[in-house]
């Protein structure tokens, strides 16, 4: 699996979630349990997104640790099969809102060249400002920074000091353009959806691998 690296948060979150879920046989459990396990994995990766991820030019992002199977095993050990984890044990994972203004396209040609591209203005019409005589709208990606640690942004995502605003710094993103290469074939995927992106790509990847 090949996916995006910070400041896009999706690749790290996707691999972390897949590592957590690798310890379960999702095809052997009922639909309710399957959904419960996926949700609990996503809650943990969004907690880590809030705490650790930011622009690697400005903060030390522990990518190797976050995608380590041993780290995922520790996350998995905290999941109860019979109940949801109390929210106060997972700060920074409030329910997200979907995003309206993102586009994703996946392309592969006859020679096997692949492109997975996620493009966004962030909110409807971005900042609402247009470059004169061009029709090009300016985005409002500044909202993807943590204006104040612990305070949600426009998509209700909680951030921390790692994603604080700084000059020349890039904001964190949920974009998750991904290539999945397996013996059964290759899948290119990504999606719009704001803070839902990581979870949707995770489910698409699981369905492809299990289907």
Predicted regions and their residues:
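Extended C-terminal regions of large enzymes
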Residues: 6-9, 165-167, 180-196, 208
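Active-site rim segments in enzyme catalytic domains, especially the processed small/beta chain
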Residues: 114-183, 198, 203
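Catalytic-loop motifs flanking and including active-site residues across diverse enzymes
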Residues: 9-16, 103, 171, 175, ...
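Structured, charged N-terminal subsegments at the starts of enzyme catalytic cores
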Residues: 1-38
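Short Gly/Pro-enriched turn/cap motifs at secondary-structure boundaries
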Residues: 5-8, 94-98, 163-172
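Alpha-helical support elements that line or immediately flank enzyme active sites
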Residues: 19-22, 191-211
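Short, well-ordered beta-strand elements
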Residues: 1-6, 13-17, 105, 114-118, ...
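Internal maturation/activation junctions in enzymes
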Residues: 23-121, 127, 133-134, 141, ...
């Amino acid at each position: 699996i090949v996916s995006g690296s910070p400041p896009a948060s999706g690749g790290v979150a996707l691999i972390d979630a897949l590592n957590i879920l690798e310890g379960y046989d999702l095809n052997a459990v009922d639909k309710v349990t399957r959904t419960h396990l996926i949700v609990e994995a996503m809650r943990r990766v969004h907690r880590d997104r809030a705490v650790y991820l930011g622009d690697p030019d400005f903060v030390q992002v522990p990518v190797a640790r976050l995608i380590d199977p041993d780290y995922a095993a520790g996350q998995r050990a905290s999941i109860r099969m019979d109940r949801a984890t109390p929210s106060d044990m997972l700060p920074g994972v409030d329910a997200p809102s979907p995003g309206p203004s993102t586009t994703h396209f996946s392309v592969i040609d006859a020679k096997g060249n692949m492109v997975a591209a996620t493009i966004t203005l962030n909110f409807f019409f971005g900042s609402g400002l247009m470059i004169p005589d061009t029709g090009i709208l300016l985005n409002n990606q500044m909202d993807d920074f943590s204006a104040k640690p612990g305070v949600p942004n426009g998509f209700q995502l909680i951030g921390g000091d790692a994603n604080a605003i700084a000059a020349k710094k890039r904001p964190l993103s949920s974009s998750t353009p991904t290539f999945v290469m397996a013996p059964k074939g290759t899948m290119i995927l990504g999606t719009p959806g704001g803070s839902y992106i990581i979870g949707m790509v995770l489910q698409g990847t699981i369905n492809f691998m299990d289907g």
